[in-house]
From Swiss-Prot:
Tissue: Milk-specific; major protein component of milk whey.
Keyword Repeat: yes
GO biological process: antibacterial humoral response; innate immune response
Any single Gene Ontology cellular-component annotation: extracellular space
Name this protein carries in UniProt: Whey acidic protein
CDD domains referenced in this protein's UniProt entry, alphabetically: WAP (cd00199)
Gene assigned in the entry: WAP
Keywords in alphabetical order: Disulfide bond, Milk protein, Protease inhibitor, Repeat, Secreted
Residues of the WAP domain: 4-54, 61-111
Pfam families: WAP (PF00095)
Domain of life of the organism encoding this protein: Eukaryota
Role, per record: Could be a protease inhibitor.
Length: 117
């Protein structure tokens, strides 16, 4: 097993680039579904993949409770025309988290551990 990231700061997904491929490929659901040392990040408006995160120094990292709600992804790829509202939790108000919402990244209310089935 690879060692855990032990760098000071907060691991964040890189900002999306307009040059990213718009293919709808979902290769991860959340950080826990990725190899150690990577995060599940949006790579286009409708794709997610395990990516080496950027480390940003933050005197008080934003740690929001809960997880993103589970989203049923379509079985067939569709071109997504929606724009992302966020790329990181700290871009969302209150306790909302930046989550994939079938086509784009949105600030959504998190689900708590006891609401998992």
């Amino acid at each position: 097993l690879a060692p855990a990231l032990s760098l000071p700061g907060q691991a964040v997904c890189p900002e999306l680039s307009s040059s990213e491929d718009n293919a709808c490929i979902i290769s991860c659901v959340n950080d826990e579904s990725c190899p150690q040392g990577t995060k599940c990040c949006a790579r286009s408006p409708c794709s997610r993949s395990c990516t080496v995160p950027l480390m940003v120094s933050s005197p008080e990292p934003v740690l929001k409770d809960g997880r993103c709600p589970w989203v049923q992804t379509p079985l067939t790829a569709k071109h997504c025309l929606e724009k992302n509202d966020c790329s990181r939790d700290d871009q969302c108000e209150g306790n909302k988290k930046c989550c994939f919402s079938s086509c784009a990244m949105r600030c959504l209310d998190p689900v708590t551990e006891d609401s998992f089935q």
